[in-house]
Amino acid sequence: MIKRIIYVILLINAVFVISGCNSRNPIISIKTEMGNINVELYADRAPVTVANFLKYTDSSLFMNSCFYRVVRPDNQPHDSVKIEVIQGGRLDETGGFSPIIHETTSMTGVLHSDGVISMARLGPGSATSEFFICVGDQPSLDYGGKRNRDGQGFAAFGRVISGMEVVRRIYALPVPTQYLEKKVTTYNISRIK
């Protein structure tokens, strides 16, 4: 009986150790004037997109960037497929890096659910430093979704692990159009881990 108890305790400890060591994914902090948003980046599932985001992060190119766009059902009168996101990044694209290949959600398995971070883009292969965070589930942004005519969706690459209350406060700001009159300053984006 004692051997069984010891075995169960060792098994439980092993599970905790394995699960704790399993996440080698980087964690970044988006430091805004409204609070911090911490995000786990899924380097194991979206390696190209995460490497690109970290290149901007490590080069301090997100310093003094902003959240400038809030997309809600009430400010998309002409869009048949409505989404809910906050968008940020570098409005000044000078000094940035080349666009990256498009890692679709069908390739990565990272779907646009509540708190997921994803790259903004015009066409496939055009993403650089603009990103958005989903407020609620947004399946129309996944591969095969109807938000983009090309059906390729957007490149989701991580999830908010703390600070969704900050995301929701930004989302709730008054915005007559999709673009904030007073942008929310992002002081910096840096690695935590």
Give, region by region, the residue ranges found by the protein language model.
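Bacterial N-terminal signal peptides that target proteins for export
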Residues: 1-9
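Bacterial N-terminal signal peptides
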Residues: 8-17
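Cyclophilin-like peptidyl-prolyl cis-trans isomerases
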Residues: 2, 16-193
